[in-house]
Amino acid sequence: MKVTDHILVPKHEIVPKEEVEEILKRYNIKIQQLPKIYEDDPVIQEIGAKEGDVVRVIRKSPTAGVSIAYRLVIKRII
């Protein structure tokens, strides 16, 4: 079974590099200020994202309709 097929898992997609710059500029932040998600997360592995990629997470929201969040993919250091 694919993790992304589960009803509770929101849609994740890799943001193209060109779009990342626009997002950072829009929110006036640096890439290191984005929330993080680990490279070994099952959804990240399934979509093929690698360390340094930015992922868009699209959730249905009862109040906002749709909620979009961005995460920076990082390696887990043990």
Curated annotation (Swiss-Prot):
Per its UniProt entry, which superkingdom is the organism in? Answer: Archaea
List the transmembrane segments. none
What are the subcellular locations of this protein?
A: Cytoplasm
EC number annotated for this UniProt entry: 2.7.7.6
Q: Which SUPFAM superfamilies match?
A: RPB5-like RNA polymerase subunit
- Which reaction does this chain catalyze? RNA(n) + a ribonucleoside 5'-triphosphate = RNA(n+1) + diphosphate
* Gene3D superfamilies, alphabetized: RPB5-like RNA polymerase subunit
Q: What class of enzyme is it?
A: transferase
Its BP terms in the Gene Ontology are: DNA-templated transcription
Show the GO cellular component annotation of the record. cytoplasm; DNA-directed RNA polymerase complex
Q: How does it assemble?
A: Part of the RNA polymerase complex.
Instruction: Please name the NCBIfam families in this protein's record.
Output: PRK09570.1 (NF007129)
What does the protein in this record do? DNA-dependent RNA polymerase (RNAP) catalyzes the transcription of DNA into RNA using the four ribonucleoside triphosphates as substrates.
Q: What is this protein called?
A: DNA-directed RNA polymerase subunit Rpo5
Look up and give the organism this protein is from: Methanocaldococcus jannaschii (strain ATCC 43067 / DSM 2661 / JAL-1 / JCM 10045 / NBRC 100440)
Gene for this protein? rpo5
